[in-house]
Amino acid sequence: MKKSLISAVTQALAVLCVALLGGCTKELTETPPSRRPLVVYMALDNDLRGEFSSRLAALRAGWRPGMELWVYADTPEGASLGRMDSTPEGVALHTVERYGEENSASGATLERVLRTVWRLCPSDGYGLLFFSHATGWLPAGTLGHPSGSRSVGSDHGSEIELESFSAALPEGMPLDYVVFECCLMAGAEVMLELQGRTPWVLASSAEVVAPGFRPLYESGLEVLTERTRPVPELLAAFGQSYMSHVEGLSGEYRSATLSLIRTSSMPALAEAVRRVTRGFADEEGRDTPPAGLQHFDRPGAYGDRPAAARFYDLEAYVEACLADPDAEAAFRGALADAVVWRDATERFLGGDGSPYKGFDIGRHSGLTLYVPRGEFPALNETYRRTAWWQATREEVY
């Protein structure tokens, strides 16, 4: 792991800079900010490095007086944490701390950033927008190498394991939501792991096609920092704005999935899934998933061999494994309670048969899950250690 390059002088200058910024940098006893502070975490020390300038410009365009917008960016030039503010020359990102070269795909780095904002900007609620590469619960590395452990962010090939990401969200910090501007993060495995860390997650079952949420920053920051409406209403509004934007695009760019998950409902959903499938008893002796299941990844598009789907629609798979019809109504209710909003285009990257290995979207429950298969014995073994597996596979008598 790369070492932090913070010096005592840099720390002193950072503290001085913070004192000059004002705004949120007050004592804990003072009144919290009128708007919800938003932390934008950009892990860009990878092939996303070219996104920094355009994203920073979009964030500046979306900032309004009274907003507490904190931006962490890790680029090949080094990492830093800044706070957006107005200057005589216009809106600018004031550097609060410089870190030099470091690994942003580290739970320790994410936790340090969140704790810094929590300390400098006391509030009774925060939001986190996380932008990077991601592969959901899948093993670290690439989609083409199914081995290792669950991953979220990417930095020069390093990735944050899912458990490390969850643990990096500080206990006690009132993190109202996480918005994943990342690929393949709306997995049941991910949401169960985040239960107890943040109550709401906005994420995509499929990949997020560039430029992602960037076109929404100018108008969307108002929504993400608002306090007057309930959090799920705000996130659904942000999500719907994104989907409306995508619906207005053409060709392969008209591709998106998005869902809003109540993480506190995930344990009940896992139990309902276990009961309705009798612990997925149907999986015994089966090497491949049932044919025709809706999936949200693009097998073969990542250099993966063998090329096989790994992100299936949760509802579609449960229906294929239905073992207790009397428990079906409870499952439907638990799913509706967990997924409070969802939307998707009719096809992704051109749909079935496209040169981009896209797919049609006939089903979209808002959650995905992995289905064990014979081609991936190491991946199957890793999957058996996830909280989702353990919560759903015990046989029901």
Question: At which residue positions do the language-model features occur?
Answer:
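Terminal, contiguous helix-loop blocks that mediate binding/assembly
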Residues: 29-31, 115, 136, 143-397
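Loop/turn elements at helix/coil->beta-strand transitions in domains of secreted/extracellular proteins
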Residues: 34-37, 65-69, 121-127, 172-177, ...
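C-terminal motif of bacterial Sec signal peptides marking the signal peptidase cleavage site
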Residues: 20-23
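Surface-exposed loop and adjacent secondary-structure segments within mature catalytic domains
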Residues: 72-95, 130-156
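Short beta-alpha junction loops
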Residues: 44-45, 72-78, 133-134, 182-184, ...
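N-terminal extension/subdomain marker
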Residues: 25-122, 383-384, 389
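Bacterial N-terminal signal peptides that target proteins for export
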Residues: 2-13
